[in-house]
Amino acid sequence: MAKFYKIWLIFDPRRVFVAQGVFLFLLAAMIHLVVLSSGLNWFEAAAAVGGQ
């Protein structure tokens, strides 16, 4: 673990962080679209449980 810094000699840190940001954004967008396209509705379920 002490020589882990050498990974940045192989990979350019800017490209790694940009790629990580793009990946996380696309993953979040995909998760949101999957949840929105499902029949799951937390508001109606909470109202049914709460009796409102």
From Swiss-Prot:
GO biological process: photosynthesis, light reaction
Periplasmic face residues: 37-52
One Gene Ontology cellular component annotation held by this UniProt entry: organelle inner membrane
Keywords: Antenna complex, Bacteriochlorophyll, Cell inner membrane, Cell membrane, Chlorophyll, Chromophore, Light-harvesting polypeptide, Magnesium, Membrane, Metal-binding, Transmembrane, Transmembrane helix
Cellular compartments annotated: Cell inner membrane
Residue ranges crossing the lipid bilayer per the database entry: 16-36
Membrane topology category: Single-pass type II membrane protein
Family: Belongs to the antenna complex alpha subunit family.
Function according to Swiss-Prot or TrEMBL: Antenna complexes are light-harvesting systems, which transfer the excitation energy to the reaction centers.
Designated name of the protein: Light-harvesting protein B-870 alpha chain
Organism of this sequence: Roseobacter denitrificans (strain ATCC 33942 / OCh 114) (Erythrobacter sp. (strain OCh 114))
